[in-house]
A protein has these predicted regions:
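Juxtacatalytic substrate-recognition/specificity segment
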Residues: 18-153
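Surface-exposed helix-capping loop/turn segments at secondary-structure junctions
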Residues: 55-69, 135-137, 170-176, 242-249, ...
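Intrinsically disordered, low-complexity linkers and stems that provide flexible hinges
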Residues: 1-19, 48-51
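C-terminal recognition in membrane/secretory proteostasis and scaffolding
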Residues: 164-165, 174-451
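Solvent-exposed, acidic/flexible segments
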Residues: 35, 39-47, 110-119, 149, ...
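Post-HExxH zinc-binding segment in Zn-dependent metallohydrolases
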Residues: 93-100, 133-134, 145-196
Length: 451
């Protein structure tokens, strides 16, 4: 039983604010230096996220999943100068964020950092269903003495990554265009690493222990994230289902099917996990789409590396996906990522087929000079702005303790930025397939705790 280890413990004098959603008390616990933070706003916004997610999985009963083990949920949040992340637990989550991620009293606008924090909250809360109760069969029970690989993380993390921002939209915390911008950012991230055409999301899932969490300097050219590409697979699958069923069904119905058949009674005795072989049948039963069509989708985009049909699927929803046109005076690029190490400009990774790769530069090289002008950690962009595409420069680097020179031909940046916007005649929406009234209830006052 993982009961004890799945409940994090924190001792100190935290700031606690509580609210009630669907009859369940939710505590937001903050530790760290917390100057002028608007805790009431954070709690109110978080309550909207929780209510929207409960409504997704239980549109009729509006029942949260925590009845199987204590009627309470806790957001343990450590606030620091510059951190970000989270880990899901059965009826809690351990979060870490920067102070600038949290709104201050009197600040009405929603900052990019606060929106990212709300996305993190949404992601970890969604895991209360999707991984903490709906589990891969190999996680039932957990093996604590060894790594347990599964090829299904594209569902458990990818689908969760898809819904984390979608829930911000459905809860009214971001606008439709803000949501489209977030989707476009994800599309840009996935499409600017060549690993997407070399590793499938199923392979990425299975190799998480050995590759995704042990990335080297060539990772961006060889692997793909089951989080980001998994979220795009979920988007495509959602649109595919909607269009095949004339918007009668969606990925929402798949999540409810998974919840009803695999998650709802997991801690009440069933201990039934999802097997890889179950996926086509689950999709078929939840949507009514033929298994042949579903298998074709899975083979191409989950187990294969075919280009996701984003443009066509979005087009059918009245959405236009475009690549932003680069201006002629766009600065050239070496197509590298660099790090500042004691003032030195060190190449962290080299994009395959980019200018640096073609010129012979390598990860680990320390950039010394470009055409005789010294490079440091802060002036690389300014030096590159002097050049045009197809021009060449002599680049000096230290490789280990050896001074080397390379002739590099610059090009326009390989990075492609995508934009997603609704067409003027758009009729379709990304609305949920079931709606109920908002039943969230804010507790009348915050509660401070010294325990």
């Amino acid at each position: 039983d993982d009961d004890l280890i799945d409940h994090p413990v924190e001792m100190g004098r935290p700031k606690v604010i509580s609210f009630v959603v669907a009859g369940i008390v939710h505590d937001m616990v903050f530790t760290g230096v917390l100057p002028n933070i608007d805790f009431e706003r954070i709690a109110a916004d978080t309550a909207k996220i929780c209510e929207a997610q409960i409504r997704l999985f239980e549109p009729e009963s509006n029942t949260p999943p925590f009845g199987d083990h204590g009627a309470r949920y806790v957001f343990l949040t450590t606030v620091t100068g510059n951190d970000y992340g989270g880990l899901e637990h059965r009826n809690s989550t351990a979060l870490i964020c920067s102070r600038k991620s949290l709104p201050i009293i009197g600040q009405n606008e929603q900052s990019k950092e606060y929106r990212e924090f709300l996305g993190l909250v949404s992601h970890e809360y969604f895991h209360s269903w999707n991984i903490k109760r709906i589990k891969p069969a190999v996680f039932a029970p957990y093996r604590l003495d060894r790594a347990t690989p599964t090829s299904l993380l594209w569902i458990f993390e990818g689908f969760t990554s898809y819904y984390d921002d979608l829930m911000l939209l459905r809860s009214g915390l971001i606008s439709e265009q803000q949501y489209f911008d977030l989707v476009a950012e994800t599309i840009s991230r996935v499409n600017n690493d060549s690993g997407r055409i070399k590793q499938s999301v199923a392979e990425s899932s299975f190799d998480a222990w050995t590759k995704f969490y042990q990335q080297d300097e060539n990772a961006r050219n060889q692997i793909v994230s089951y989080y980001t590409k998994g979220s795009l697979v979920a988007l495509c699958l959602d649109l595919f289902i909607r269009q095949k069923t004339e918007h009668e069904k969606s990925l929402d119905d798949v999540m409810r099917y998974l919840w009803t058949h695999f998650g709802k009674n997991f801690y009440l005795g069933s201990q039934l996990g999802l097997r890889e072989a179950d996926v086509p049948e689950v999709l078929h039963q939840a949507t009514g789409i033929s298994q042949d069509e579903l298998l074709n989708f899975l083979e191409r985009y989950v187990y294969g590396t075919k280009k996701l049909p984003l443009k066509a699927l979005l087009e059918a929803e009245g959405l236009k996906l475009t690549t932003l046109t680069k201006k002629s005076n766009t600065p050239v690029s070496l197509d590298i990522r660099t790090a500042n190490r004691e003032g030195q400009c060190v190449i962290q990774s080299v994009m395959q087929h980019g200018a640096a790769h073609q010129g012979g530069l390598s990860a680990g090289d320390v950039l010394v000079a470009i055409d005789g002008l010294r490079v440091n950690a802060s002036n690389l962009e300014e030096l590159l702005s002097r050049y045009q595409s197809k021009q060449k420069a002599l680049v000096h680097v230290f490789r280990r303790d050896e001074l080397r020179s390379f002739t590099v031909e610059f090009n326009t940046p390989l990075y492609a930025e995508f934009q997603l916007q609704p067409k003027k005649d758009r009729l379709a929406t990304m609305a949920p397939t079931n709606e109920v009234e908002d039943t969230s209830e804010q507790m009348p006052s915050q509660v401070e705790s010294e325990q």
